[in-house]
């Protein structure tokens, strides 16, 4: 053991230094194991930790890796995992639970920073054996803590990419120089499997990087071209077990390619390259950001030095310069910026390929440190002049970079002086190389620690680390409800949600969803039926819809912290401040239509769509919704078809109405084109006969449940808009839903019973129908679904674009739906074939050598 540690102690140090620094950086935010402040912020809170919880439940036997019903009516979990869960460390979530999952995020994030340091040190040690170990440790720490990784740590699966990149670079070097192909093939295959998005960028990077590497000795290294092409292809092929189903899912449900509408990228300016080389510089991770390229001040200095060294041939410098120039130009030209990102505009976290620039800086700096004794005074002075000129120009014109503070400038100039003095000292041989290595490594650790702390401060101010209490809110009650509901294959929705993925967090089947991986066909259809999912369908929300939609989509349970006043919903269980309500009129997740189902045409009118959809299913022609006349009790201002309400003094804008409601009515208030003067406050408070209801308008329609009455009744309604002195909207409409008519239509569908259950990635629907009909599944249509009856495959048809139906004859039967991601089997065969071909190719190469 002592011998092992003596031999490999630097590997341990390369792993532990980034972890220690990040522990300190986290601590500065009050974050540690089981701390009151969690390590969750932004998407980390709303998405990543929740998907970790879903994976944990699956690993414990509750669910399938292929499909989940806890999001968006149903979702291809395999495709979601390829984007959000691709990590070596994802299986560790098995050992955590819902309550302490933030600690899993804390632990795995620290481990990933450590593993980046370790893999980078391994790479530098293989490629540059003559560089003193402290310098390699300094560079590996710089890479682990570069601005790109720290500022975007909430997207924690991105960190895994940088564990693999140094291994891929090392593998490519071994392929070129020693004809060894295993490391390159293995590491590249794993990257493609873990993260197809960064895999695409890496593939582009490797083309340029390969040209850079063969330029060092073209005559000898050109023979590696065939190996590079074949092994890269086989690595891509080996990943098809994951990437092929994902690509087909993206083809069906992904966003359209972004059109290039302008020449220059947003917010870019001439000195961006220097502005982001100031220690601690942080602008934003939202829109209008310039690239996160800082990887330490010293690598930047050494990269400039690289182009002045005589021992490096001109054509090598030229190839490297072209690569650097192409990257820099890409930061400015919209078309190239999109090209690196697959022709898709990122939803914040811009310039996602900026890590390539940082990677280039590290490995170019290593080339210079490998030639430390060759550096002359004039090399250093030329480089220093260029750097100082760039920094001074940026300082002089810093009005263009409002994020640069005096502290950023002071720290950068101080470290620039320190690095310059140390470089001068080693060039003039005032100090030994070993002493230089130790001293400069210590300063680099401080440099990167300060920068990491600044990045964390930046994202904390921008997104805010969630408190542990906020994360834990409602967990005991929700777990109690989950136990009460049991394993019923029904749907549940929580009315006061914290995230768009609460159903996945608390492990109940629901509608709401917030994910880049989604079934856009289903979401678009649901949008027309009142569950808002506009634009690219990134969000889908349950709130602010009708009880008719509840019935159609099998919402059997509602959870609320206040009375919900919905027809058919009865309170059945209470825990803490939450109450569980059961819907007496919900349909099962699969039900029989009255005849073979034919699509109805949807319009832009949500309630008309709901009515025509239910009528088609029940084979009736009922009117469910009708407007209710109302009286305004206050004067309001009408301009351009908009009603504008302005409050006096500091009061909230408010308006009052009075309506006469017929018996057996569920009442709704619809605002169209509702605009708030305060975009940060978008809630609506409604008092109905003195009883208060609060609604959100965030990512949902402005369609509010006023309440249910069995008898004829007068509703006095007071609508206020907290935090807003002025609001405007089109003339509102009060709607009455006839509950007797709704009940009749739902009962007519229930006359032909269908019993539904599920197991893993299968759904079982047992039916008894009196005529030829369709079994309608309110499950998103996906080509991964197959239907079987009596061990024979039967046809699944799309219904209303987003859903599924299976036509069946009169009688009894059971339909089994099975989900295997589209092209999964083909991808698995390709992956197995790739491994076989790799083995054969490697064997033939060895045979050829012999």
Model feature map: region roles:
Residues 1-31, 434-435, 440, 836-850:
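Start-transfer (signal-anchor) and selected internal transmembrane alpha helices
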Residues 2, 631-850:
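Active-site-proximal, structured, solvent-exposed surfaces of multi-pass membrane proteins
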Residues 11, 15-120, 141-162, 201, ...:
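Membrane-interface coil-to-helix junctions
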Residues 42, 46-47, 53, 88, ...:
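Periplasmic/ER-lumenal interhelical loops and adjacent helix-loop junctions
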Residues 78-83, 102-115, 135, 142-166, ...:
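Membrane-interface micro-motifs in multi-pass membrane enzymes
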Residues 109, 113-127, 133-176, 180-215, ...:
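Membrane-embedded helix bundles of polyisoprenyl
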Residues 198, 322, 326, 344-470, ...:
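Contiguous transmembrane helix-bundle modules in multi-pass membrane proteins
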Residues 443-464, 483-552, 587-588, 592-604, ...:
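Extracytoplasmic/lumenal acceptor-recognition loop(s) of multi-pass membrane glycoenzymes
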């Amino acid at each position: 053991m002592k011998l092992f540690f003596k031999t490999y102690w630097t590997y341990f140090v390369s792993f532990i230094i980034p972890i220690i620094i990040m522990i300190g950086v986290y601590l500065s935010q009050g974050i540690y194991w089981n701390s009151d402040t969690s390590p969750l912020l932004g998407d980390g809170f709303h998405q990543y930790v929740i998907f970790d919880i879903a994976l944990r439940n699956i690993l414990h036997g509750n669910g399938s890796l292929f499909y989940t019903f806890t999001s968006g009516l149903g979702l291809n979990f395999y495709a979601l995992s390829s984007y959000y869960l691709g990590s070596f460390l994802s299986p560790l979530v098995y050992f955590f639970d819902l309550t302490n999952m933030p600690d899993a995020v804390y632990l795995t994030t620290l481990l990933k920073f450590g593993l980046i340091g370790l893999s980078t040190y391994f790479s530098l040690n293989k490629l540059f054996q003559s560089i003193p170990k402290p310098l390699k440790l300094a560079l590996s720490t710089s890479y682990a803590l570069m601005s790109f990784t720290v500022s975007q740590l909430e997207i924690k699966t991105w960190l895994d990419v940088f564990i693999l990149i140094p291994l891929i670079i090392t593998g490519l070097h071994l392929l070129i120089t020693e004809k060894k192909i295993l490391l390159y093939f293995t590491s590249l295959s794993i990257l493609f499997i873990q993260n197809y998005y960064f895999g695409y960028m890496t593939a582009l990077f490797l083309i340029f990087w390969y040209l850079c590497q063969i330029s060092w000795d073209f005559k000898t290294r050109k023979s590696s071209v065939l190996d590079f092409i074949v092994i890269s292809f086989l690595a891509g092929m080996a990943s098809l077990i994951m990437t092929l189903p994902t690509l087909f899912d993206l083809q069906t449900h992904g966003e359209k390619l972004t059109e290039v509408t302008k020449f220059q990228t947003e917010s870019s300016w001439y000195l961006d390259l220097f502005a982001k080389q100031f220690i601690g510089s942080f602008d934003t991770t939202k829109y209008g950001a310039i690239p996160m390229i800082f990887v330490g001040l010293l690598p930047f200095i050494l990269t400039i030095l690289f182009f002045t060294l005589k021992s490096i041939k001109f054509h090598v410098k030229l190839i490297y310069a072209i690569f650097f120039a192409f990257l820099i130009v890409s930061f400015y030209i919209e078309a190239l910026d999109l090209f690196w990102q697959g022709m898709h505009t990122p939803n914040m976290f811009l310039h996602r390929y900026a890590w390539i620039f940082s990677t280039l800086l590290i490995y170019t700096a290593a080339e210079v440190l490998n030639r430390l004794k060759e550096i002359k005074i004039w090399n250093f002075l030329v480089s220093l002049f260029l750097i100082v000129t760039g920094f001074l120009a940026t300082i002089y014109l810093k009005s263009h970079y409002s994020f640069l503070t005096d502290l950023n400038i002071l720290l950068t100039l101080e470290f620039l002086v320190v690095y310059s003095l140390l470089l001068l000292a080693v060039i003039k041989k005032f100090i030994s190389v070993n002493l230089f290595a130790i001293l400069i490594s210590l300063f680099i650790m401080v440099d990167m620690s300060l920068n990491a702390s600044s990045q964390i401060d930046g994202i904390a101010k921008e997104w805010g680390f969630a408190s542990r209490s906020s994360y834990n809110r409602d967990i005991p009650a929700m777990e109690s409800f989950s136990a009460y509901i049991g394993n019923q294959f029904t749907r549940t929705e929580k009315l006061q949600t914290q995230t768009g993925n609460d159903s996945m967090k608390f492990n109940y089947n629901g509608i709401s969803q917030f994910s880049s991986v989604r079934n856009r066909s289903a979401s678009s259809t649901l949008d027309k039926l009142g569950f808002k999912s506009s634009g690219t369908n990134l969000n889908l929300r349950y709130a602010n819809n009708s009880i008719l939609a509840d019935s159609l989509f099998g919402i059997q349970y509602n959870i609320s912290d206040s009375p919900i006043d919905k027809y058919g919903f009865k309170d059945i269980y209470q825990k803490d401040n939450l109450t569980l309500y059961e819907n007496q009129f919900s349909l099962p997740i699969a039900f029989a239509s009255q005849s073979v189902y034919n699509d109805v045409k949807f319009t832009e009118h949500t309630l008309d769509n709901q009515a025509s959809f239910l009528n088609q299913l029940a084979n009736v022609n009922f009117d469910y919704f009708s407007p209710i006349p109302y009286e305004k009790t206050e004067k309001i201002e009408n301009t351009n078809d908009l009603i504008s309400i302005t409050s006096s003094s500091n009061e909230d804008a408010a308006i009052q109405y009075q309506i006469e409601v017929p018996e057996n009515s569920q009442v709704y208030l619809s605002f169209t084109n509702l605009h708030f003067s305060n975009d940060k406050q978008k809630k609506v408070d409604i008092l109905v006969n003195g009883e208060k209801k609060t609604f959100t308008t965030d990512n949902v329609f402005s369609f509010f449940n006023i309440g249910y009455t069995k008898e004829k009744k007068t509703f006095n309604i007071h609508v206020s808009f907290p935090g807003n002195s002025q609001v405007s909207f089109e003339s509102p409409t009060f709607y009455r839903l006839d509950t007797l008519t709704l009940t009749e239509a739902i009962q007519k569908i229930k006359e032909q019973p269908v019993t539904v259950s599920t197991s893993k990635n299968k759904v079982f629907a047992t039916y008894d129908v009196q005529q030829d009909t369709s079994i309608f599944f309110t499950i998103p249509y996906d080509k991964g679904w197959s239907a079987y009856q009596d061990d024979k495959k039967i046809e699944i048809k799309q219904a209303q674009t987003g859903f599924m139906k299976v036509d069946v004859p009169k009688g009894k039967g059971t339909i089994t739906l099975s989900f295997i991601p589209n092209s999964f089997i083909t991808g698995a065969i390709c992956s197995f074939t790739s491994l076989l071909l790799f083995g054969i190719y490697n064997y033939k190469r060895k045979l050829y050598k012999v």
